[in-house]
């Protein structure tokens, strides 16, 4: 076919503007990059389908158009969210949050320790500060008005919060402004201090403020306004370590809150804003300005007339140091506070943190008269002595176990010697006598007082003192080591029986620092022979308690300080008078016979009979300082039917000789007996003179034999002839006209059998042999020469 010579039209290729060129797509795939997007096609011109010219929509003359309808809708939604979301959140929080009942919120507050007559001994001030809660009706109305004038003038009408204060908090925390600022109501301030804390800046501060707002609002609906105001006035800080209006009243004016006048109440209200810097002792002008502002506020709210306001005078305050000292327990009372606190923790099985929130009023068994007598006696007889000399005194009521006097030292924060473990010397012989009587050995049982030797160790009495073969009652009076060592060996279980009798009477089986008392191995094993001579450690408290058991005819009462405990709400938590802690530990006949044997000893010990011929039963004790021949400790323990008192005298470390101001050795019949007599006489002055019960028979003897008598066949070896009558001559020296003092031990002159007759006494009245604890072979015996 011949070629077609007709003209053909060449059409350009049709391209889809949304599809990239194939070559570009392949190249992009090979290079691992996204394919390029083609440029958008030009929009059509205004006039139709041709290319747009300069005046088309793509040119610079195009305007961006705002859809105001959607803007209005979005703004409305945002405002709704900003308003509704906080309200919804507030409502949910209001429903969820639990507001405690009035009185359920525990805040640290002071507990007061009182003597038996209601006088104050000490105050237990918690670390968080000094606070004593009071009821709203104890706070004068004008004081309440002053606080409202200073802090919340529409307190009784507002809903518990301030919107202006809350909005200011939002502004300051979101945009700066120095942290949260004033405007809080009294309710909000209370919630902040008691429940939500005091974070003051940033988002945390804003959250805290929101919590405060919710709780304050709900609290205002559930608590009465008086309950809120009472709680607030008991928790707010006033400076000088005083939390609450009651403590502040004492800290600034040294008076109870009930006695505050208008001017004083206005000053305390003025301090709330800046308690430390507005203290009149720090900034008197600033305090006066704020005080005047509060008084003017009282006029504004109608709580004070202008005439009364004009009559007010700025009140004087006590020095800040005085307020601090009021919260510090000093002298021996500090050690009483320590023991009362420990007893409370044990009594209620609580910790100190819990104790510090109770605001307790603790009435103790301490008798102010007995306490004063003990302190005065120690001060009198230790005056002028070695500065290292120390003393301890404990007096206990045998009928209850109540501690009537307690002296462990003069330093409130120092070492308490009444709680120290100390060797007791011959005062422990009493428990050997208890054990002997329990085994049927009567007071008339005769025993040799001559020297003896055990395992190569010689045991003797001071200056060769002895009574030949005499009764165990006479040997106790003379404090003969040799006689009681032999008596202990005669017991069924020897030293173990002595220890058991001591524990039964009230010597503690353990105390802080000593896991097992009266134990040679310290692990509860048996004691050795030195126990009869007081080798092992006991406390002054324990000795007073054990002797009190004898005074009570064998009935033990646990020694205690706490008589009654009342909390800040007036609820009685404990009343010792309703507790029955008496327990018969020792047979009555045994205890009464021991008392009979001890009755002559106070007079025998250098004339320490009690005033007015009051009967007493007592025993001295002296402990030797190692193998030096000097003394280390000296004791006097004794009682009447109504009071048992133990006295110890020694030195701070127990490593130096115990001598008086004249350089003479101190024995139990010396300074300790002086202190004991002065304490007992002072404590018992004005009380009835009581007699001890008449003992019943044990081993053929009812009490101390009054005439020679042969012991029953089972009681032991035959007796020596009876003891002759003696006249006691006490050497004295006149130190001033008409005033004499004794010097040295008394001398006796026999008026019965001639000197040297069997059983005649030798040197009675001499002090007992000091006991050397830990001597080799026979603990408690003097070392070999």
Swiss-Prot record:
Residues 759-775 have a biased composition (Low complexity). Residues 118-299 are annotated as: Transglycosylase. Residues 1-61, 605-626, 690-726, 738-785 are annotated as: Disordered. The active site is at 151 (proton donor), 426 (acyl-ester intermediate). The chain crosses the membrane at residues 77-97. Residues 33-45, 708-721, 743-758 have a biased composition (Pro residues). GO terms for molecular function: penicillin binding; peptidoglycan glycosyltransferase activity; serine-type D-Ala-D-Ala carboxypeptidase activity. The keyword Transferase applies. This is Penicillin-binding protein 1A. The gene is ponA1.
